[in-house]
Amino acid sequence: MATNLQIPPALKKRAEQIKVLLMDVDGTMTDGGVSLLSQTEEIALEIKTFDAHDGQGLTLAHTAGLRTGCITGRQSSALLRRAHEMYMEFIYMKQPLKMPAYEEIVQKTGVPESAVAYIGDDLPDIPVMRRAGLAVAVGNAVPEVKKTAHYTTKALAGHGAIRETIELILKSKGIWEAMIDKARA
């Protein structure tokens, strides 16, 4: 987490406009590992690990009035549960191409693309990142994603990158201190 984040003016200008925060899941909300627990030869239980600091950040984002969501290529009941716990409004799973989901969210919210932030880590995220007003790469994203991003987190995927992005947005808006007072468990 970047608690003493110094925000360059151009980045601040982008971040202060954000009203919708979208993100990838595997390699962004999680560290990218996919753990499978075999139950039978045909059935496996998928286990995902989510970061508590990222969760607190998502709760603060919701409290601040940001609309949040995720777009992922995989189907996951663990993700669905976590997304609901974090008050995510938009949950798009089984999306091999992310642009149709992104465009639908932009249409549903009625916000300009300059008011949308997207956090990603890998090649399927690049088309959305090219359109989002604030494109964020997690610290361990592939080089092509980092090159596309307006900001790369110091934190790694699944270890505070979402929280760092939310802090960037809320600090740019000048409401971070007020959100600290509203933090809840």
Task: Please report, for each region that a protein language model flagged, where it lies by residue.
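Short secondary-structure boundary/capping elements
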Residues: T49-H53, I71, K94-L97
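Short, conserved SAM-binding/catalytic segment
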Residues: E85-M86
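Fold-independent oxyanion-binding glycine-rich loops
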Residues: D24-D26, G32, R74, D121, ...
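Short secondary-structure boundary segments
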Residues: V25, G73-R74, Q95, G139-V142
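A general structural signal for stabilizing positions within well-ordered secondary structure
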Residues: P9-K12, R82, P143
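Mg2+-dependent phosphoryl-transfer enzymes with acidic/Ser/Thr/Gly-rich catalytic loops
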Residues: I43-A44, D51, I91, M99-A185
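Active-site neighborhood of HAD-like aspartate-dependent phosphohydrolases
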Residues: A2-A64
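Substrate-recognition element of Asp-dependent hydrolases with the DxDx(T/V) motif
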Residues: V34, G57-R82, Y92-M93, M129
